[in-house]
Design a protein with these regions (language model features):
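Short acidic, glycine-rich surface-loop motifs adjacent to enzyme active sites
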Residues: 95-103
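Alpha-helix C-terminal capping segments
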Residues: 84-90, 117-128
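A cross-family phosphate/adenosyl-ligand binding-site feature
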Residues: 1-5, 16-87, 91-92
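Glycine-rich phosphate/pyrophosphate-binding loops
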Residues: 123-144
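Hydrophobic/aromatic beta-strand patches that form the interior of the parallel beta-sheet core
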Residues: 32-34, 71, 97, 128-132, ...
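Glycine/threonine-rich flexible loop motifs
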Residues: 104-113
Length: 274
């Protein structure tokens, strides 16, 4: 039986990046394309609620010259993935491919990334995941600008082939791949670590405002090159222009010798004798 590949994203069913992801693996297995009904950028691993959450609609999507069934789900990417696995898949998928996202997911941005979170949600159900993103200007996140997807398809396909053939190590949940805007299929690919820098930084727009009025914060990709880790995802894609692949795990435990100190546990407050 051919592998079953779940293809999802956070940009919505009609994103060119989702189509590029599906095309990159279309001959590697059977496709199950399930994505949010609307743009869901920066929702992280939110299980949103609402009267219409979980509503599913079938669509026909042209992928590599053939018509493939695709499904939109009202809700966040993790809601879409959960419904895909619980009620749309006819068997457990062999791989979840999340992307290809408009906008790189590196450094502190992983904490809010739906592209990464969708792949992690699949892994929570036992399905290995790849999160793939391509570097674009922040202004392009929601506009679906025309892009050359050839390099992104190339590297996404290569990683998918490897995961389908070899699986992932037991301590790896997801591969987080980021492709530079000017990459070609010959661009170097590098294993990296997640940078501790936040990368996307918010600021207030200029001018005055009425506090009760809505306000959209400005956001910009920001790098402190002098403090950037040598083997980090940000350095790879932003400074060196190479493809970054970071193996991610579920653990958020810091490797430190920190211990709670007894002198702070006794604050002089009365304690129960019961």
């Amino acid at each position: 039986m051919r592998p079953l590949i779940l293809v999802t994203n956070d940009d919505g069913l009609h994103s060119p990046g989702l189509l590029a992801a599906a095309e990159s693996v279309s001959d590697l297995g059977d496709l199950l394309i399930v994505a949010p009904a609307t743009q869901q950028t920066s929702m992280s691993r939110a299980f949103v609620t609402g009267d219409d959450i979980g509503a599913i609609e079938r669509h026909d999507l042209r992928v590599a010259g053939r018509t493939v069934a695709a499904y939109s789900v009202v809700g966040s990417p993790v809601v879409a993935v959960t419904h895909a696995l619980l009620e749309l898949a006819d068997r457990p998928p062999d791989l979840c491919l999340s992307g290809i996202n408009y906008g790189e997911n590196v450094g502190g941005a992983l904490g809010v990334s739906c592209t990464v979170s969708a792949a992690l949600e699949a892994e929570a159900h036992g399905v290995p995941g790849i999160a793939a993103s391509v570097q674009v200007d922040v202004a392009s996140w929601r506009k679906f600008d025309d892009l050359d997807w050839s390099a992104a398809r190339h590297f996404t396909r290569a990683l998918a082939r490897q995961v389908l053939a070899d699986g992932l190590p037991s301590d790896v949940a997801v591969l987080n791949a980021n492709i530079p805007r000017d990459a070609t299929p010959n661009t170097e690919i590098r294993r990296t670590v997640q940078s501790r820098q936040p990368y996307y930084v918010h600021s207030l727009p200029e001018g005055t405002r009425v506090p009760t009025d809505p306000l959209r914060l400005r956001i910009a990709a920001t790098v402190d090159a002098d403090q950037l880790e040598a083997n980090s995802d940000i350095r790879a894609i932003v400074c060196d222009g190479v493809v970054s692949v970071t193996p991610l795990s579920w653990s958020m435990t810091a490797h430190t010798d920190w211990q709670p100190r007894a002198e702070y546990l006794d604050d002089g407050a009365p304690r129960s004798t019961r």
